[in-house]
């Protein structure tokens, strides 16, 4: 199952580079008959203060998706355990459909804006499909947890590239300061966002090289030069190797999309593993020890790719 979930992430390139599709088309398979069990740790968080004001069409769309996500979590929290998954999917599906419709119906402002909007819709659609796949085959007790956790992390990464308040799991939102064991993954997550932003501004054929260089530079800067690239984290290095294998003889733009998807999946896996793991005996342990605990937990749980 772990290998199947990781394979799904690698092949999301077909969804990301293809035409954007409404989430309504996915609801037919997004609400399976098996009822969900209670989800732990997803009670809605109280407002954490003013978020950055959305200015671009893309930012406004992400903000609406963010609001819809939190409304769906709140709705799921108020129904019996057996209805949580179905309620979340229905509520979030309606909100995201509305956001898509409003974004696509705005007055055209040029080919560049239309292209940017279409790219965002495609990435959002891919995030929804990834979340559904992550919950596919899960036990009733885990289905809601898996779906919401995967979707929230995917949306957070997408939102990060737009420099706007992103969706975060409620358990993370209620914390004023990240726990010590999350700080290393926070740096990796931040490096990913920097690299994705740089790649988005580069020509299609240069996105892959720009992303990889920016990602390594950001990691080096955030660790004070202690690490030169992503290779100090085994799970990331393994993800990169697999993404390279999947991009042989493909166009540069496609290669970048597969590479980005693979890293996104690996970072999400490590983040979830660290959140689930118990705090280390020494909260001031080294970065290497923290990363080792995270990757070890992920591997033990599901081959290193459980989300």
From Swiss-Prot:
Range of residues in the leader sequence: 1-22
Highest taxon of the lineage: Eukaryota
UniProtKB keywords: Allergen, Signal
InterPro entries: Poa_pIX/Phl_pVI, Pollen_allergen/Os
Tissue expression notes: Pollen.
Pfam family, one: Pollen_allerg_2
Xref: Gene3D superfamilies: Group V grass pollen allergen (1.20.120.320)
Family indicated by similarity: Belongs to the Poa p IX/Phl p VI allergen family.
Note: Its C-terminus might be membrane-associated.
Protein name: Pollen allergen KBG 60
